[in-house]
Regions:
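Extracellular/periplasmic solute-recognition and catalytic clefts
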Residues: 1-51, 74
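Beta->alpha turn/N-cap motifs
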Residues: 15-22, 69, 88, 169, ...
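Ligand-binding "clamshell"
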Residues: 23-36, 181, 195-212
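Structural transition elements
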Residues: 81-121, 139-144
Length: 214
């Protein structure tokens, strides 16, 4: 691994993500040598807006409300990632003009109550939960995030959401997204340049990256 090669002196530095479970330990063992830098990138899940039930905006809102980003950034990943509720980083040029939604400041208990209400209004119950799959490309960190998200959605909505995980190798995963063969999928974007439109262009109706069909 890169960690072993670095310790042996074969590597001077690496830009590969360290295993989350080793990060804090390595920071203590190698003070001043293990650190992360902020990048113009966002990790997200996209929902297939052309496919039921995600053609219902209230279902999409319920998922947004009941996902605790802080758990993912602080406990699952734990390498300095910042929780956000918008796609464009606020520290990119002109990104400071973008406002986080009001619900991001609400207590999780309140957000969960709102999510449950929206799901019940959409016809879901413990006997008839919202069922869907999260598609992600094969990677241990993606798997850990997906497991955490699935668990939170189920717990925070008191069983109104039931999520399964589906992993595919990179090429198949990309093909599935482009063809719309998914419910929810791991997504994200790395900036091409230091200006907010590099993230906004992702959602243009004629963009090949707009696989969620906004």
């Amino acid at each position: 691994t890169d960690v072993a090669r670095y310790r042996a002196g074969d590597l001077d530095m690496t830009n590969y993500a360290l295993p989350p479970e080793q990060f804090a330990k390595l920071q203590k063992e190698l003070p001043g040598e293990v650190f992360t830098t902020r990048t113009l990138a966002t990790y997200s899940y996209e929902l297939n807006n052309k496919k039921a039930p995600f053609d219902n905006v209230n279902v999409r809102k319920a998922l947004n409300l009941s996902l605790d980003r802080n758990v993912i950034t602080d406990k699952v990943l734990g390498q300095g990632q910042t929780p956000t509720y918008v796609f464009t980083p606020t520290y990119i040029e002109e990104g400071q003009l973008i406002q986080q939604p009001a619900y991001s400041k609400e207590p999780m208990a309140q957000r969960n109550e709102e999510a449950i209400k929206l799901l019940e209004e959409a016809g879901y119950s413990k006997a008839n939960p919202l069922k869907f799959s999260i598609l992600y490309n094969t990677n241990e960190n993606h798997k850990k995030v997906a497991i955490a998200a699935a668990s939170m959605w189920k717990a925070n909505t008191k069983g109104l959401i039931d999520v399964k995980l589906e992993n595919q190798e990179w090429k198949t995963y990309i093909d599935s997204r482009r063809a719309g063969r998914y419910d929810a999928a791991r997504a994200g974007w790395n900036a091409d340049y230091n200006q907010a439109t590099t993230f906004g262009n992702y959602f243009l109706s004629n963009s090949s990256n707009n696989t969620a069909k906004y």
